[in-house]
Regions:
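Flexible hinge/capping segments at coil-to-helix
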Residues: 1-19
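Beta->alpha turn/N-cap motifs
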Residues: 2-3, 23-26, 44-45, 61-71, ...
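Short helix-initiation/N-cap motifs at beta->coil->alpha
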Residues: 7-8, 24-27, 40-54, 89
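Secondary-structure junction motif
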Residues: 10, 20-35
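Short helices/loops that flank or line small-molecule/ion binding pockets
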Residues: 13-16, 33-35, 46-61, 65-66, ...
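Periplasmic-binding protein-like
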Residues: 28-31, 64, 68-125, 128-135
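Residue-level signal for nonpolar/aromatic packing positions in well-ordered secondary structure
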Residues: 52, 60, 93, 105, ...
Length: 135
């Protein structure tokens, strides 16, 4: 939503009267339905952001990684921001049972977190908001 309006919408209840743009058939559309939001289905998440930028819709529901990369300072949509999470996103990597790759990947994640590489990459690609500390 427009960064200038962000403080007016601290939670889902405060957004009840907004018109949202959401990707048709997406988890975003599911969240719009679940929350009883008014929404316009669009072809993809990039179009949802464009709808907000053009003023056709007041807000969009998109993936948090997409939001972090597409809106805010240093992007084409510097006057937009993201605010609340309507659900959680979790990603996983799977390997064949008995493979030693899971342990190797876990070691890589721990080492790249410890030496700052993971943070540097997250900063570089605009996904810091989705970074999960490795312990």
């Amino acid at each position: 939503l427009p960064a200038a309006d962000a403080e007016s919408y601290p939670d889902a209840a405060s957004m009840a009267d907004l018109q949202f743009a959401v990707e048709s058939g997406s988890a975003g559309e599911d969240m719009a339905i679940e929350n009883g939001f008014n929404y316009t289905p669009v072809v993809d998440q990039a179009t949802a952001v464009l709808e907000v930028s053009s003023g056709t819709c007041q807000a969009a529901i998109i993936d948090s990684l997409m939001a972090a990369a597409m809106v805010g300072e240093g992007t084409s949509y510097a006057d937009l921001t993201y605010t609340i999470n309507l659900n959680s996103e979790e990603y996983g990597v799977g390997f064949r049972k008995g493979s030693d790759l899971a342990a190797a990947l876990n070691d890589f994640f721990a080492a790249s977190w410890a030496d700052g590489t993971m943070q540097t990459l997250a900063d570089t690609y605009g996904v810091t908001a989705a970074l999960i500390p490795q312990e």
